[in-house]
């Protein structure tokens, strides 16, 4: 099997084996927190490391890309005054009143004319927002409203003219056709929105569903690319040395735990980009991630399964057989179900959109332990279930069992998750310590 060309000597926290260094691109939790130990005051917390990687990335403003706003549920509140929110305005969930106030303040330079009769720290609500404009503007900025998002009168005029021109009917022309004679599908939806025959005739993805799928697929691609950059930092798989030596066994175990850390980081990065996830409270974010991470890792493992070689490939170049899993310290009772699940998933033949939707559905599982707002989690899950149902009916209209088969795989993952818990317990009996991040995500208490 292939291995990275560089060896690193930074110890994995808790087991004394090598692990990737903790530079800005490292998959470990130093990426954003700079400390491997929990921050002061968080000792004893079961989620100190997870909280760190859930924090927003501190990246330059110019690198942030505008994406579609998460779907509104109808009961969101304005981040400025607490009134009912109407949508995302100038980068913040806010009401129409605060949206208009912020725009007027920026366009007409109101900030220089506002004054506070108090100490400049007025508490803002639907009543006080009319009483103190200076503190209202301050609260707008604290909530995250960006002046650069506000268009000037001239920009608005040009945008209005451009929109009117786009709405004018184009000259008649023949629609572009695909090789099958149907109009070509829009990019990113695997032609699902344009396919249809038999039972699937007439079903179409809504514009919101197409946008959702495109966003999820793009987010997965972005997270995968970020993981590839961490490949050279992984402890090399020992080659040539005595495979039964203590050093070789430790190195193989460190290699696998570092791959797991990269995978966890990738899953957290993806979850933060799934519309609706960051609307949840921090406790529910942590609860959902703790319960779903191993199941998503198994889905991604199945995605990388090669039925011809009966091997699984991670990070493009790391390929593992059943024997490799066993040499890394995993039990046959866990290895065999992984490969059986991977073969079953391959028979379903999921594409990128189906995998992304299935992972999003898995994340928003309201019955997870310690979830504080299960009804809200369930409401966030529903649009992804509906999108997957429509997508599968369009893509495979003759296969009416495809959608329920996919959902049944989530049930299989629950069983595999239980087997994984037994595997983690077995590692403890072998005195193999997991890095802190994995210990927290899998609730391992030393």
Curated annotation (Swiss-Prot):
NR LBD domain ranges (all copies): 208-446
Intrachain S-S bonds: none
Gene Ontology MF: a single term: DNA-binding transcription factor activity
InterPro entries named among the record's database cross-references: Liver_X_rcpt, NHR-like_dom_sf, Nucl_hrmn_rcpt_lig-bd, Nuclear_hormone_rcpt_NR1, Nuclear_hrmn_rcpt, Znf_hrmn_rcpt, Znf_NHR/GATA
UniProt-annotated stretches for the region Transactivation AF-1: 1-76
Crosslink position(s): Glycyl lysine isopeptide (Lys-Gly) (interchain with G-Cter in SUMO2): 395, 433
Domain of life: Eukaryota
Primary location group: nucleus
Annotated segments matching region Disordered: 1-69, 159-201
CDD domains for this protein: NR_LBD_LXR (cd06954)
SMART domains: HOLI, ZnF_C4
GO terms under biological process: cholesterol homeostasis; hormone-mediated signaling pathway; lipid homeostasis; lipid metabolic process; mRNA transcription by RNA polymerase II; negative regulation of cholesterol storage; negative regulation of cold-induced thermogenesis; negative regulation of gene expression
Tissue-specific expression: Ubiquitous.
The entry's DNA-binding region: 75-152
Record's keyword annotation contains Iron: no
Keyword Transcription regulation: yes
Family recorded in the similarity comment: Belongs to the nuclear hormone receptor family. NR1 subfamily.
Subunit structure: Forms a heterodimer with RXR. Interacts with CCAR2 (via N-terminus) in a ligand-independent manner. Interacts (when sumoylated) with GPS2; interaction with GPS2 onto hepatic acute phase protein promoters prevents N-Cor corepressor complex dissociation. Interacts with ABCA12 and ABCA1; this interaction is required for ABCA1 localization to the cell surface and is necessary for its normal activity and stability.
Protein name as it appears in the record: Oxysterols receptor LXR-beta
Species this protein is from: Mus musculus
Lineage, broadest ranks: Eukaryota, Metazoa, Chordata, Craniata, Vertebrata
Gene it is expressed from: Nr1h2
